[in-house]
Amino acid sequence: MSWLTEEDIRRWESGTFYDSYRKLGAHPDDEGTWFCVWAPHADGVSVLGAFNDWNPEANPLERYGGGLWAGYVPGARPGHTYKYRIRHGFYQADKTDPYAFAMEPPTGSPIEGLASIITRLDYTWHDDEWMRRRKGPASLYEPVSIYEVHLGSWRHKRPGESFSYREIAEPLADYVQEMGFTHVELLPVMEHPYYGSWGYQVVGYYAPTFRYGSPQDLMYLIDYLHQRGIGVILDWVPSHFAADPQGLVFFDGTTLFEYDDPKMRYHPDWGTYVFDYNKPGVRNFLISNALFWLEKYHVDGLRVDAVASMLYRDYSRKEWTPNIFGGRENLEAIDFIKKFNETVYLHFPEAMTIAEESTAWPGVSAPTYNNGLGFLYKWNMGWMHDTLDYIQRDPIYRKYHHDELTFSLWYAFSEHYVLPLSHDEVVHGKGSLWGKMPGDDWQKAANLRLLFGHMWGHPGKKLLFMGGEFGQHHEWNHDTQLEWHLLDQPYHRGIQLWVCDLNHLYRTNPALWHDGPEGFEWIDFSDRDQSVICYLRKNAGRMLLFVLNFTPVPREHYRVGVPIGGPWHEVLNSDAVAYGGSGMGNFGRVEAVPESWHGRPFHLELTLPPLAALILEPEHG
């Protein structure tokens, strides 16, 4: 009996075997296990493990076309650990299975450390209702508010001990639901030996990290979140892979998964290796991996890490090799990204793909048939950098940098954007969001509430890294839990309540969902002397007015032109006492009088609290 068919080999060789995880890796039956691995340059491959006392001579594999090796091992059962012994000339190494569905923790002996585990992926799902109604591309016209989470440091059950996948399910779902977020985005859960990489230096692309439990435990977490109405996005890292010798690097004694070109194969920023997207086996491996997480784990989307490093051959390099036309664009990576997105949406049209792309590359979220890269969303890194640069300034100097606040609206509709305040902004000495805010504690809290008010008013979906929602003092530390004790203090409870109320307003008001140009209208972006901006969000007959005062100076009788007369309701005020503010405002209601201002036929005369966001709505729209 042959494990691989001629059609399997044809698809593998053509780089279109996008469900290759069904054949490669370890696949147990009642009597033993089929093993299959890609090692085209190997002179010999055998499987060794707990079932043969780690004897590399006991179970040699047979060579097939396309550089594939396969064989059946009687008595190899689920739970057994294993590796592949690869021989190429004088080279010999014991390698972790690239397609392993589970791996042991990154500890153990030099022979058995990081061994793969024969694993069945059986699980009974209970999320049918969620899977039927999840949005995917339809989310462009729905609220999307993402809570970014590192599972190992969100909350600890005791000092230094993280929750398991199963243990964290209920408290995480309770919190996310209470806070009003629509999705959770998990930092990479794929197996990574170096905990301090936060999951971005992957060895086991098909194996959820063993630190928090089994594959079924992770399935339970995702299933539970779905049952609570919460979507799950995974960070996915096809841009580079870990340098651990047991992993993908120099897999068959040659540069197999990585580039052959020494100028291109190594990533100097991260000490990792770069995938060679030209190789059919690499494309099979990565695109299959994306589909694997969407199918087997029911994830709702993939956030693709470090896309800019894939697009440019000279990204963060002093020496690099141009493409065939002499340019800096990585043509094979571009083609891979397009094929990845096309394949995902072909098989999972209700999924989401999101690009962390930090340059001005055009059409990141445009469809491939319009010469785009095909992602559904792109992180708006320009908005993030400009807004954080602005809000960190002493308010007395903000008027000289007013364009940092307003420039993002020139390009806000060029892509389908997510506004990210991610983990990257609260690490490596950058400080926490709270720490970035100028002034004393009162001003820090007010500035942070103001930042969030503008973020939720600005066009684009929302993403906030854990801890930011209550103003954590210290930058994120993956070894400790968040500073939950700060919620004993009024300022931090107030910030948390403000984010909660912003989320609930966002989810219930269609004026905030439509991120096209017709859903946004400037009222005034030119009052740099007083550092005030005001704009409308509108959709489906609803309208919200945002008035933002970026100085600690209260402003009485501040006029704002509006298109509708009559009473306007003060929906939210970040300076409310409940949020830790001074309680200044407009007593919940103000009348728009028929006198032109800002080119509108009516105007409101408002009291602007210091460092505050006001959100108003006409009572009769």
UniProtKB/Swiss-Prot annotation:
InterPro entries (UniProt xref): A-amylase/branching_C, Branching_enzy, GlgB, GlgB_N_E_set_prok, Glyco_hydro_13_cat_dom, Glyco_hydro_13_N, Glyco_hydro_b, Glycoside_hydrolase_SF
Pfam family, one: Alpha-amylase_C
Active site: 305, 356
Keywords tagged on the record: Carbohydrate metabolism, Glycogen biosynthesis, Glycogen metabolism, Glycosyltransferase, Transferase
E.C. no: 2.4.1.18
UniProt cross-references to Gene3D superfamilies, sorted A to Z: Glycosidases (3.20.20.80), Golgi alpha-mannosidase II (2.60.40.1180), Immunoglobulins (2.60.40.10)
Enzyme class: transferase
Keyword Isomerase: no
SUPFAM superfamilies hit by this protein: (Trans)glycosidases, E set domains, Glycosyl hydrolase domain
Assigned GO CC terms: cytosol
Reactions catalysed according to its record: Transfers a segment of a (1->4)-alpha-D-glucan chain to a primary hydroxy group in a similar glucan chain
SMART domains: Aamy (SM00642)
Pathway(s) where this gene product acts: Glycan biosynthesis; glycogen biosynthesis
Any one GO molecular-function label of the UniProt entry: hydrolase activity, hydrolyzing O-glycosyl compounds
GO biological process: glycogen biosynthetic process
Task of the protein: Catalyzes the formation of the alpha-1,6-glucosidic linkages in glycogen by scission of a 1,4-alpha-linked oligosaccharide from growing alpha-1,4-glucan chains and the subsequent attachment of the oligosaccharide to the alpha-1,6 position.
Oligomer status and interactors: Monomer.
Family: Belongs to the glycosyl hydrolase 13 family. GlgB subfamily.
Protein name according to UniProt: 1,4-alpha-glucan branching enzyme GlgB
Naturally occurring in which organism (per UniProt): Rhodothermus marinus (Rhodothermus obamensis)
Gene: glgB
